[in-house]
């Protein structure tokens, strides 16, 4: 590994003086490692050369098994298997395309909007090799979303799929910085470069840049639940963090593992869970190109392929449980992880009963990556997002950054002083005011409300501005939404605060009904739902107001925009 070779003696673990070889071995095997931060990390690091190329070398030396590094399938019978050596070749070609054909250089911004196709991985690592800052986005983006992202970031290039070419073309004239447009497509498009053709003719010889640990690597747009999406800029520490032995306990991946992470490529979880985490461990990334999630296909895939770990949104597990198949004992699956929201307690139990496996919950943001989790060896507390993952010192704080005692509601904070931890975003690009707003004393204030118990388990309540103060009671919307989700009439719901002349605020639920309940008497159904909530949770949490809607406002990443609903209630729209 390049940066290791430049150090004859590295003193990075307290009490140890390590040669490069010893350090590498300790990085990949030590379990009880102390905290790492910017002071004891290497000065230079690049995921492409120090991780992917390392495993390519291990393959050449016969020190890694025959399993592919990348295994991609779709529903039409197509299959791709790439070794780390093949990935090295293809990503070097990609880097040459960016530098020699597109004229891009270190520090330039590239918008990456692709579905789950192999080229997404090539572009991402190609950007790492060149120092180009990649900015992933979901293919659900519309023209106005793309315009906003390109303009605010001053992106010089975009790589996207054929279906989004018209969307980009409709706004390209308003993006003076956008010089290069590359498309992943089977057909040519006027004014666009054919990405696949270019990498076929490009040279596989490329010298990776020597990036500093603090050099920018990626920008992830926030979900926009509280306004326009902000640009959370991350440096190389986001990738290096996966080296930290304590961080490697998250999934405990081995080179023999096959990980299926179902995250949308536009989210930070895809960069971490579909690329950084598995390839740091030298294991296989498995991808099924699902344009839309089909629970039947998911079940079939888990039976057909030797997948050992699964990382998916709660809705995926919920949909699988709804399948009528009697057998969900997947032959090779060993570990399941979820995040984004909580499953109901009975859903956790059903999954355990039907698969024999527990579901471990993780929590994170665009700014943090995964910051807390229920690790494999930890006791599972249903509804908890687990404990903080090193190097994050996660505490519950008040508005001034004071640490609150256990079981006291506050904000999830991550300590940033005296040292900003690896993996935490650098800043909100082009928005120093927004960056300052989330710095709270010695902590980064996530804006998410939670409590922490005596054992260090964190209990998520919701966004800070989502918490409802009704008649002196503070109510987290997630609690009420989970209660409503247990009723068969409710397809999905969003709970917000609504003004009330007598109580100041009351709980209001916006509910999308399942089709079979659309013809029911609405007044009677409201009473039934209110009674149901009272029966399954504290009665003061029940929604005094209920409105049935056909759909809920959501961000492009699928998060409910409660702020929009709340503003409507208080007449701010």
Curated annotation (Swiss-Prot):
Superkingdom field: Eukaryota
Binding locations of ATP: 222-230, 448, 463, 559
GO MF term set: ATP binding; benzoate-CoA ligase activity; decanoate-CoA ligase activity; fatty acid ligase activity; GTP binding; long-chain fatty acid-CoA ligase activity; medium-chain fatty acid-CoA ligase activity; metal ion binding
Location(s) in or outside the cell: Mitochondrion matrix; Mitochondrion
UniProt-listed Enzyme Commission number(s): 6.2.1.2, 6.2.1.25
UniProt keyword list: Acetylation, ATP-binding, Fatty acid metabolism, GTP-binding, Ligase, Lipid metabolism, Magnesium, Metal-binding, Mitochondrion, Nucleotide-binding, Transit peptide
Modified residues (N6-succinyllysine): 81, 142, 179, 200, 233, 324, 352, 387, 501, 534
Modified residues (N6-acetyllysine): 142, 200, 210, 352, 387, 527, 534, 545
Pfam families per UniProt: AMP-binding, AMP-binding_C
Transit peptide start and end: 1-35
Tissue: Highly expressed in liver and kidney.
Annotated TM spans: none
Cofactor dependence: Mg(2+); Mn(2+)
Keyword Transferase applies: no
Catalytic activity: a medium-chain fatty acid + ATP + CoA = a medium-chain fatty acyl-CoA + AMP + diphosphate; benzoate + ATP + CoA = benzoyl-CoA + AMP + diphosphate; (R)-lipoate + GTP + H(+) = (R)-lipoyl-GMP + diphosphate; octanoate + ATP + CoA = octanoyl-CoA + AMP + diphosphate
Cellular component GO terms, alphabetical: mitochondrial matrix; mitochondrion
Gene Ontology biological-process entries: fatty acid biosynthetic process
Subunit-structure text: Monomer.
UniProt record similarity statement: Belongs to the ATP-dependent AMP-binding enzyme family.
PANTHER family: ACYL-COENZYME A SYNTHETASE (PTHR43605), ACYL-COENZYME A SYNTHETASE ACSM1, MITOCHONDRIAL (PTHR43605:SF5)
Record protein name field: Acyl-coenzyme A synthetase ACSM1, mitochondrial
The organism of origin for this protein: Mus musculus (Mouse)
């Amino acid at each position: 590994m390049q940066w290791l070779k430049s150090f004859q003696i590295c003193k990075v673990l307290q009490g140890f003086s390590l040669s490069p070889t010893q350090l590498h071995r300790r990085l990949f095997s030590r379990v009880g490692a102390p905290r790492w931060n910017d002071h004891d990390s290497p000065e230079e690091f690049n995921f492409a050369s120090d991780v992917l190329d390392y495993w390519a070398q291990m393959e050449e030396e016969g020190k890694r098994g025959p399993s592919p590094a990348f295994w991609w399938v779709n529903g039409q019978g197509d299959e791709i298997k790439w070794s780390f050596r093949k990935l090295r070749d293809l990503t070097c070609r990609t880097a040459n395309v960016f530098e020699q054909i597109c004229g891009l250089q270190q520090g330039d911004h590239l918008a990456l909007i692709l579905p789950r196709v192999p080229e997404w991985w090539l572009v991402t690592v190609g950007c790492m090799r060149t120092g180009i800052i990649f900015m992933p986005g979901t293919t659900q983006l519309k023209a106005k979303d793309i315009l906003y992202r390109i303009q605010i970031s001053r992106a010089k290039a975009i790589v996207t799929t054929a279906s989004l070419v018209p969307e980009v073309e409709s706004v390209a004239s308003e993006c003076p910085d956008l010089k290069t447009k590359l498309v992943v497509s089977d057909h040519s498009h006027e004014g666009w470069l054919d990405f696949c053709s270019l990498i076929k003719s490009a040279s596989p010889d490329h010298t990776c840049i020597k990036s500093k640990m603090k050099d920018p690597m990626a920008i992830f747009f926030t979900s926009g639940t509280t306004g326009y999406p902000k640009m959370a800029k991350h440096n190389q520490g986001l990738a290096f963090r996966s080296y930290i032995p304590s961080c490697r306990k998250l999934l405990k991946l081995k080179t023999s593992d096959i990980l299926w992470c179902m995250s949308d490529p536009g989210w930070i979880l895809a960069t971490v869970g579909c690329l950084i985490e598995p390839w740091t461990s030298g294991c296989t990334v498995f991808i099924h190109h699902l344009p839309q999630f089909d629970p039947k296909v998911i079940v079939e895939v888990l039976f057909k392929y030797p997948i050992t770990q699964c990382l998916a949104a709660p809705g995926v597990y919920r949909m699988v449980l709804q399948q009528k198949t009697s057998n969900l004992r997947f032959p090779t699956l060993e570990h399941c992880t979820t995040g984004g929201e909580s499953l109901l307690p009975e859903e956790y139990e059903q999954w355990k009963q039907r698969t024999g496996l527990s579901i471990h919950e993780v929590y994170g943001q665009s700014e943090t990556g995964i910051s807390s989790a229920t690790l494999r060896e930890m006791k599972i507390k249903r509804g908890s997002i687990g404990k903080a993952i090193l190097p994050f010192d996660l505490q519950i704080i008040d508005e001034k950054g004071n640490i609150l005692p256990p079981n006291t509601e506050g904000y999830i904070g991550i300590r940033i002083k005296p040292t900003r931890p690896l993996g935490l975003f650098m800043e909100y690009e082009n928005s120093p005011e927004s960056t300052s707003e989330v710095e709270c004393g010695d902590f980064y204030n996530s804006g998410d409300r939670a409590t922490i118990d005596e054992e260090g388990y964190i209990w998520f309540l919701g966004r800070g501005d989502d918490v409802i103060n009704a008649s002196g009671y503070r109510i987290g919307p997630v609690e009420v939404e989970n209660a409503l989700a247990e009723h068969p009439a409710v397809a999905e719901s969003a709970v917000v605060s609504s003004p009330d002349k007598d109580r100041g605020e009351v709980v209001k639920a916006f509910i999308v009904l399942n089709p079979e309940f659309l013809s029911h008497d609405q007044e009677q159904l409201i009473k039934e739902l209110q009674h149901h909530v009272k029966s399954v949770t504290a009665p003061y949490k029940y929604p005094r107001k209920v409105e049935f809607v056909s759909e809920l406002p959501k961000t492009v990443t699928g998060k409910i925009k409660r702020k929009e609903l709340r503003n409507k209630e208080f007449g701010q729209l």
